[in-house]
Curated annotation (Swiss-Prot):
Residues 3-151 form the N-acetyltransferase domain. Its EC number is 2.3.1.-. GO terms for molecular function: acyltransferase activity, transferring groups other than amino-acyl groups. This is Uncharacterized N-acetyltransferase YsnE. The keyword Ribonucleoprotein does not apply. It comes from the Bacteria.
Length: 151
């Protein structure tokens, strides 16, 4: 698998990000959706990666700089044709390694509290993320859980 920084202009990547946003609208009430659209993902504080198997998009993920010591994982998504093949593990490992290179002391994330998000929570737990209070601009939300990992 090849993981590369992506400018979010390719058809497959745009489609996967839009699919991610649409799925969030099906699983979460509007006030609890924290997924970012293409324009926000192109912001200077965010690095977005796409993961490829040959010419087929396998998944994506992003790292948002909250401050010089703290990063946030955003937009983790696996293409439907690559589910349960270890794509998310590889993308997450790549993001963690990049956060360490940047000198971040902590990496945090927000994900859903509903059953449909259980695979994501289990993945993050397996990498040593622990549940925490809301961080950055997040507030308490019964549809969200917050996790963090010291680097």
């Amino acid at each position: 698998m090849h993981i590369k920084i992506d400018d979010l202009t390719g058809r497959q990547v745009v489609s996967l990000v839009n699919e991610h946003l649409h799925s969030m609208t099906l699983m979460s009430p509007p006030e609890s959706i924290h997924a970012l659209g293409l324009e926000k993902l192109r912001g200077p504080e965010i690095t977005f990666w796409s993961a490829w198997e040959g010419d087929e998009l396998a998944g994506c993920g992003a790292l948002k700089e909250l401050d010089t010591r703290h990063g946030e994982i955003k937009s983790m998504r696996t293409s439907a044709s690559h589910l349960r093949k270890g794509v998310a593990k590889q993308v997450l490992q790549h993001i963690i390694e990049e956060a360490e290179k940047r000198g971040y002391e902590r990496l945090s994330l927000e994900t859903g509290s509903m059953a449909s998000f259980e695979p994501a929570r289990k993945l993050y737990e397996s990498f040593g993320f622990q549940y925490c209070e809301p961080f950055a601009d997040y507030g308490e939300d019964p549809n969200s859980v917050f996790m963090t990992k010291k680097l």
